[in-house]
A protein has these predicted regions:
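Surface-exposed helix-capping loop/turn segments at secondary-structure junctions
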Residues: 49-56, 125-135, 173-178
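Short, contiguous alpha-helical
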Residues: 33-37, 41-44, 54-97, 139-186
Length: 186
């Protein structure tokens, strides 16, 4: 192999190795915060996709309205993230009302504001913790028991995605394509 070819290979390995080192600097807290912020944008987009006049739509009498689905996420985010035992003051929610957590849908703007506030609270809480603190155990809700902070945060994210799936159906039943489907999905 010529000197030029060997030098070229060495340069390629150095570049690849440097990229790998950069990838190793990711942190649990950084990844979790990124996931939370990404989900905030995703949920605000799907919440905003429904026209305001259809915020009262529900597929059956037994289900929540579209606005109530959004408020459920907003309130659940606050309720669940309070279990991380952070020092940030939480927005007021009624923890005896697991449907909307006492939040009311007086307008689309109010609903979207509540959703953003719930996510902003989660962001503020997550910013308090280091990687080591995220793996510490806290008391979760009774149905989870003792959990790590990171599990509690990811449980909260997965709960919201469950509701996202329901909201996508609400949109399609009203002829609206969910935002993620407009851009080709995942």
């Amino acid at each position: 192999m010529s000197l030029v070819a060997r030098t070229g290979l060495i340069v390629v390995f150095i570049i690849l190795g440097t990229g790998h080192i950069g990838a190793q600097t990711a942190t649990l807290s950084g990844d979790l915060l990124t996931d939370w912020q990404t989900q905030k944008r995703t949920m605000l987009a799907i919440a905003d996709a429904m026209p305001e006049e259809l915020f009262g739509f529900k597929p059956t009498d037994a289900q929540r309205t579209y606005a109530e689905q959004v408020l459920h996420i907003a309130g659940a985010n606050v309720y669940l993230m309070q279990h991380l035992a952070g020092g940030v003051e939480a927005p007021a929610v009624d923890t005896t009302d697991f449907s909307t957590f006492g939040l009311e849908a007086t307008s689309k703007a109010v609903v979207l504001e509540a959703l953003a506030e719930g996510y902003d609270y989660g962001i503020a809480v997550l910013q308090e913790f280091s990687d080591e603190e995220l793996v510490a155990t806290v008391s979760g809700p009774r149905y989870l028991g003792e959990v790590t902070r990171v599990r509690m945060a990811y449980f909260t994210l997965s709960h919201a995605m469950d509701i996202y799936g329901q909201m996508a159906v609400y949109l399609r039943l009203n002829g609206v394509t969910p935002p993620a489907s407009r851009r080709g999905g995942v």
